[in-house]
C-alpha cells in the first residue's frame, strides 16, 4: 500500500491538531465543576462520563496524521491509568500544554533535542520536590477524603475507606453492578475459593443449604480419592478427636464419597469434601496457600507423601469453615503468622515480576485471600446510564486511594504542581535546555488554569495568587474559597500527580523530536467499478 509522508513543521502541525482535538474533549471534565462527555455506543444507550481515559480511548479522527497525534495523547492517559489508576485528565492537560509550547519554540528555531534535555531536567526536579512535600496517608478519615475527592461523592469515600479498613491495603476490593438503587459494601472475611460441596447430603443447615464446620481438621491433597481405604487411617484419627473434617482433593467420588455421605447421615462423623480450586500450576500454588494459612501440609506425591500414611499432625486447622453449593470459605486459619507473612512477600515479588495482566490479577487475588479477605462494592443507580458512569467513578476512586496509600498525598486541585514551580524555576540551564525548562514551568500552571476555567473563572489570576501563597494553601473551585487544601481534605495521591507529569513529558518530548510522519494513503473509491461483466451467466439455464 502507498504511504503518505509529511516532514518537520507540516508533520508536527498535523499531529498538534489531533492532540488539541482529543485534549479539548477531555479537559472539560477537570475539577469539581468539570462537565461530562457523552459517548455514542454502537449498541445500547450512550455512555455519559467524566473519566479522561474512557473518553480518550473513544476518539478516532478521520485524518491519519491528526489521529496519530490524538493516539499519542491517549497513550499518556492510558499509561497514567495503568500505573496510578487515576489522573488521566491531568496527564492529558499537561501533555497538551507541553506539546503546544514546545512546538511554538521548535518552529521559532529551537533545537528539539536541547529542548527535550531541558524538559527532562525540569521534570526530575519537579518530581523530587513532589516527593518532599508529600505526606503519608494515615487513618480511615484520610483514605475517605482521597476517595471522596476522586469520586466527587462523600458516601463513596466512606465506603472505600471502610472496605480498605476491613480487608487491609492488600485486600481485594471488587466493584459489581447491583440490582438496587443504593451502593452497598459486602465483605467476605477469610479465604474463599470457588468450589462447593461434592454432595448436597453434606449440608448441616438445610434452610441455607450450607455446611458449617466448627474447628475442623483440613486434609489438603492434589490426588483423586475414590477408595475410602486410602484415607481411612487419618479419618479414624480425626473421629477420635471428635472434630469435623474438610477434605480438599482433586476429586472425591465413588465408594469414598458414598462412605462419607452415609457416615454424615448416620451422625457418626461430619465430613465435607470439596474439589481443589484452580487448574494446573495455579492449583498447586493455591493448595500451598491453603496449607500455609491453615498450618497443614499438601499431601502430594511430588513431596513423597502418601495418603495412607498421613498423620493428624499433617492436617490444617481453622476456627470455622462454611461450604455452600459454589464456594468454600475458611475463617481464621491456624497457620504460623511468620510463614503466612513470608508467603505473602513471595507472592508480592511474583506480582512485581510478572508481565502478564491476567497472571498479575490472579496473584493479587491470592495475595488478598492470604492477607485478609475480599470486599465487594455493589453499585446501585436509577438508570443503566447512571450506573455505568457511577461505576467508572468508583473504580477511579479506588485506584486513587490505593495510589495514596502507596506513595502518600499532596495538595489537590492542581495546587501541588504550582507549589513545586519555584524550585523548578531555580534550575539553571543554557540555550535550548532553558527553553525546555520554561515549557515545563508553563505546563505546571495548566491544570489549575483549566480547573478555574471550568468553574467559570479567569485562570491567570488564580495562578498568580497561588504562586505567592504558602505551600498547601490553594483554591477550592467547588466553593470559590482559598483554603488549606490538606486540612479541608482536598488532596491528590502523589503517585497520580507524579505519573501524570512523567508520562506527559515523555510523550511531549517524543513528539517534539519528530521530524517525519508516515501514514497509509487513503484508498481512492473506484466510483463506477461495480461487478465484472457476467453476461455469460445467461447460459446457466442449461445446467438445470
From Swiss-Prot:
This is Chaperonin GroEL. GO terms for molecular function: ATP binding; ATP-dependent protein folding chaperone; isomerase activity; unfolded protein binding. It is an enzyme of class 5 (isomerase). It is found in: Cytoplasm. Forms a cylinder of 14 subunits composed of two heptameric rings stacked back-to-back. Interacts with the co-chaperonin GroES. Keywords: ATP-binding, Chaperone, Cytoplasm, Isomerase, Nucleotide-binding. ATP binds at residues 29-32, 86-90, 413, 476-478, 492. It catalyses: ATP + H2O + a folded polypeptide = ADP + phosphate + an unfolded polypeptide. The keyword GTP-binding does not apply. Belongs to the chaperonin (HSP60) family. CDD domains: GroEL. GO terms for biological process: protein refolding. InterPro entries: Chaperonin_Cpn60_CS, Cpn60/GroEL, Cpn60/GroEL/TCP-1, GroEL-like_apical_dom_sf, GROEL-like_equatorial_sf, TCP-1-like_intermed_sf. The keyword Nucleotide-binding applies. Its EC number is 5.6.1.7. It comes from the Bacteria. It comes from Bacillus velezensis (strain DSM 23117 / BGSC 10A6 / LMG 26770 / FZB42) (Bacillus amyloliquefaciens subsp. plantarum). Together with its co-chaperonin GroES, plays an essential role in assisting protein folding. The GroEL-GroES system forms a nano-cage that allows encapsulation of the non-native substrate proteins and provides a physical environment optimized to promote and accelerate protein folding. GO terms for cellular component: cytoplasm. It holds the Pfam family Cpn60_TCP1. PROSITE patterns: CHAPERONINS_CPN60 (PS00296).
Amino acid at each position: 500500500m502507498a504511504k503518505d509522508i509529511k516532514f518537520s513543521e507540516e508533520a508536527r502541525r498535523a499531529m498538534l491538531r489531533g492532540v488539541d482535538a482529543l485534549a479539548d474533549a477531555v479537559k472539560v471534565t477537570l475539577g469539581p465543576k468539570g462537565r461530562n462527555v457523552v459517548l455514542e455506543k454502537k449498541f445500547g444507550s450512550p455512555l455519559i462520563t467524566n473519566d479522561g481515559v474512557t473518553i480518550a480511548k473513544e476518539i478516532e479522527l478521520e485524518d491519519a496524521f491528526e489521529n496519530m497525534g490524538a493516539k499519542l495523547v491517549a497513550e499518556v492517559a492510558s499509561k497514567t491509568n495503568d500505573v496510578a489508576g487515576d489522573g488521566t485528565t491531568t496527564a492529558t492537560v499537561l501533555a497538551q500544554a507541553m506539546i503546544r509550547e514546545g512546538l511554538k519554540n521548535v518552529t521559532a528555531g529551537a533545537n528539539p533535542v536541547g529542548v527535550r534535555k531541558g524538559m527532562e531536567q525540569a521534570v526530575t526536579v519537579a518530581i523530587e520536590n513532589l516527593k518532599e512535600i508529600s505526606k503519608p496517608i494515615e487513618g480511615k478519615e484520610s483514605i475517605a477524603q482521597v476517595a471522596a475527592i476522586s469520586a466527587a461523592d462523600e458516601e463513596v469515600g466512606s465506603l472505600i475507606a471502610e472496605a480498605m479498613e476491613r480487608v487491609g491495603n492488600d485486600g481485594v476490593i471488587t466493584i459489581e453492578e447491583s440490582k438496587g438503587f443504593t451502593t452497598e459494601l459486602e465483605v467476605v472475611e477469610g479465604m474463599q475459593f470457588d468450589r462447593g460441596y461434592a454432595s448436597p447430603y453434606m449440608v448441616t443447615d438445610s434452610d441455607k443449604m450450607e455446611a458449617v464446620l466448627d474447628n475442623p481438621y483440613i486434609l489438603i491433597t492434589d490426588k483423586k480419592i475414590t477408595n475410602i481405604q486410602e484415607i481411612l487411617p487419618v479419618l479414624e484419627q480425626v473421629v477420635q478427636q471428635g472434630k469435623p473434617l474438610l477434605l480438599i482433593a482433586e476429586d472425591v467420588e465413588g465408594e469414598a464419597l458414598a462412605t462419607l455421605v452415609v457416615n454424615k447421615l448416620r451422625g457418626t462423623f461430619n465430613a465435607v469434601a470439596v474439589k481443589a480450586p484452580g487448574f494446573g500450576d495455579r492449583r498447586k500454588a493455591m493448595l500451598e496457600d491453603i496449607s500455609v494459612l491453615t498450618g497443614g501440609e499438601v499431601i502430594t506425591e511430588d513431596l513423597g507423601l502418601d495418603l495412607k500414611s498421613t498423620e493428624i499432625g499433617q492436617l490444617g486447622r481453622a476456627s470455622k469453615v462454611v461450604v455452600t453449593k459454589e464456594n468454600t470459605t475458611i475463617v481464621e486459619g491456624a497457620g504460623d503468622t511468620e510463614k503466612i507473612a513470608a508467603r505473602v512477600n513471595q507472592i508480592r515479588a511474583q506480582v512485581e515480576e510478572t508481565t502478564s495482566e491476567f497472571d498479575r490479577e490472579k496473584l493479587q487475588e491470592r495475595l488478598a485471600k492470604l492477607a485478609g479477605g475480599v470486599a465487594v462494592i455493589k453499585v446501585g443507580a436509577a438508570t443503566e446510564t447512571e450506573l455505568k458512569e457511577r461505576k467508572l467513578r468508583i473504580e477511579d476512586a479506588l485506584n486513587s486511594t490505593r495510589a495514596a496509600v502507596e506513595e502518600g498525598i499532596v495538595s489537590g486541585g492542581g495546587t501541588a504542581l504550582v507549589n513545586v514551580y519555584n524550585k523548578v524555576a531555580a534550575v539553571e540551564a543554557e540555550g535550548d535546555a532553558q527553553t525546555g525548562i520554561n515549557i515545563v514551568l508553563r505546563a505546571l500552571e495548566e491544570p489549575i488554569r483549566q480547573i478555574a476555567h471550568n468553574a467559570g473563572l479567569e485562570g491567570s489570576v488564580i495562578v498568580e495568587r497561588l504562586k505567592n501563597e504558602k505551600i498547601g494553601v490553594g483554591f477550592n473551585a467547588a466553593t470559590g474559597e482559598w483554603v488549606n487544601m490538606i486540612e479541608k481534605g482536598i488532596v491528590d495521591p502523589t503517585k497520580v500527580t507524579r505519573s501524570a507529569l512523567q508520562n506527559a513529558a515523555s510523550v511531549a518530548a517524543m513528539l517534539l523530536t519528530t521530524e517525519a510522519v508516515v501514514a497509509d494513503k487513503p484508498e481512492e473509491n473506484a466510483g463506477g467499478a461495480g461487478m465484472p461483466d457476467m453476461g455469460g451467466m445467461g447460459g446457466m439455464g442449461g445446467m438445470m
